[in-house]
Amino acid sequence: MSDYNTGGPPPGPPPPAGGGGGAAGAGGGPPPGPPGAGDRGGGGPGGGGPGGGGASGGPSQPPGGGGPGIRKDAFADAVQRARQIAAKIGGDAATTVNNNTPDFGFGGQKRQLEDGDQPDSKKLASQGDSIGSQLGPIHPPPRTSMTEEYRVPDGMVGLIIGRGGEQINKIQQDSGCKVQISPDSGGLPERSVSLTGAPESVQKAKMMLDDIVSRGRGGPPGQFHDNANGGQNGTVQEIMIPAGKAGLVIGKGGETIKQLQERAGVKMILIQDGSQNTNVDKPLRIIGDPYKVQQACEMVMDILRERDQGGFGDRNEYGSRVGGGIDVPVPRHSVGVVIGRSGEMIKKIQNDAGVRIQFKQDDGTGPEKIAHIMGPPDRCEHAARIINDLLQSLRSGPPGPPGAPGMPPGGRGRGRGQGNWGPPGGEMTFSIPTHKCGLVIGRGGENVKAINQQTGAFVEISRQLPPNGDPNFKLFVIRGSPQQIDHAKQLIEEKIEGPLCPVGPGPGGPGPAGPMGPFNPGPFNQGPPGAPPHAGGPPPHQYPPQGWGNTYPQWQPPAPHDPNKAAAAATDPNAAWAAYYSHYYQQPPGPVPGPAPAPAAPPAQGEPPQPPPTGQSDYTKAWEEYYKKIGQQPQQPGAPPQQDYTKAWEEYYKKQAQVATGGGPGAPPGSQPDYSAAWAEYYRQQAAYYGQTPGPGGPQPPPTQQGQQQASGNCHPPPPPFSFQPPATVHPALVGSAGNPFPCGVCP
């Protein structure tokens, strides 16, 4: 062990495992350093001389040098003072000193500072950060947070949120403000947005929201709330809405206030405070141009006055009032007629009534579509009346095709196959192969819905089986006007890539039990061709449809019933459709003035067409053809054989022609014959035939086939008059014992 100076104390004890520093030299240095942590013994600083090294001590410090121990002790003192100050300020929040560590709990950090070859400045900076992190929670920096309610247009909420919330997330990230949008507007045109954050963050978020709304409206960025406050050219006016009537102005789902804003071109805000009593009047703020604001105020007051009068919101004979308008239900198959070709009809209704009409969008499955009429109440009712008149004219419908054999011709076409009432114009039933039904219906019914919307017709699958019961086919029904049915038929044929097979009669044909149409002349026209409906009576007058129904073809009297054509129409549905459309689309325009002569029978197959009659009509050929057809029909069992009166009728007409021209025997030239007796006999026979008191005669004859007159005293049809005049006098050679021409041997 080395010698010490005379003035120095004896050396300290050797440090364990590599010794500590020696004692301070003469001159009185500070206490020796702590024990060495490694195999090296740190020499303590000496004022008068170097300290003694340990057994394996490290190198001694130079004389008078200040080693790291001085700086570390000073730093530890500063930390201790800081902790004392923190304890005085924070009380129990101050951090306690761990007595298990040598120097104020920083023994664990000694190796971090001592080990390594980093400069001392980095070591101190790292230690300062550690101290600051421990002292940081004691004094958090002051931060001001606020929450503000902001309003944006309800229609712009989707634009503010963005796809997948992208836009609202960008607003929150860029502004540092939390943005929350209320889930519902409560019927108001604006949606509440909650902004939470620092004042500058909230202000930035508001600016970003204004920019998005302004861009969505097509205006310059940042102009939304400036315009909402009226701007330089705008006017803001508030009117008080009485308690309990705020919902009337707002409407269901905000529909009424939206319509008012659209019609007046203003912005309306109903100020509602949740803390207010429901019995308190609420202000309605109207923003816009002065003239428009005044007009909007009048519209709102009109709504409130109608409510006071009890007329608003009630349902009338035309539909339901909603938001100052009227909803009129229109059958789906009649929508195309109300709209008209290229919208001509609905434009005409709008111009005449001074309203606006729109059909509401729906799923296309219901039987009706809603036409919403917007405008003043009296004009809305006028437009609704026009639409209902048009629908009423549709219910009478165009004439249908001929019915079954022996049935009267079709009347006005609303009769279905079962005789019940249906849509105007009737319906069409057709069969489609089962494996192609999916092409018509589509996934979820989307194809049939599209067909209904495009054509205005109503297409549905029938639950009835095909007539032959074939399970490989399904029946479909199309209801609507002829134009709508044709359009829907064309679209369906494109889907299945083939023609449709109609089943049953065409639209408007009366069923087996269907009543006769209002224009059917009655049983008198069931006789042979050439006879007038009522002998000597004028034809039915032709009145064009009045009002809004004049867009449809005018009704013409039906042609004489032809049994062969009726049988062909019953067996071939296509023939019935062809006759129906030819009658519907090719009618001669305008009524025919004056009594028209009875139509002649169509020429038989293979015969040339007859020239138009001039002067006195000759029905000889028509009667011959009629009796030939009657003779071809099968006789009923037990009925007496029919006789051929063709020659007798020819002779009869020849003599009648002579009488009419004044060449008959006993007729003075130029004198008008007297038909009184002939008319009396004719009406007596008609009364006896139709169940009234029969004239004197023998027993009733047995029933004969349809089309043959069968009554006592009138077993054969009376001779048809010329130009609606009865025969003058029957020739004695042609008169039977009872005054009837051509006695059959059954009648007396």
UniProtKB/Swiss-Prot annotation:
Sequence repeats: 572-583, 618-629, 644-655, 674-685
KH domain ranges (all copies): 145-209, 234-300, 323-387, 425-492
Positions with biased composition (Gly residues): 18-28, 36-69, 409-422
Post-translational modification N6-acetyllysine, affected residues: 88
Cell compartments where the protein resides: Nucleus; Cytoplasm
Spans annotated as 4 X 12 AA imperfect repeats: 572-685
Keywords: Acetylation, Cytoplasm, DNA-binding, Isopeptide bond, Methylation, mRNA processing, mRNA splicing, mRNA transport, Nucleus, Phosphoprotein, Repeat, RNA-binding, Transcription, Transcription regulation, Transport, Ubl conjugation
Disordered, as annotated region: 1-78, 90-148, 394-422, 498-570, 588-650, 659-678, 689-735
Protein name (record): Far upstream element-binding protein 2
UniProt source species: Mus musculus
Gene assigned in the entry: Khsrp
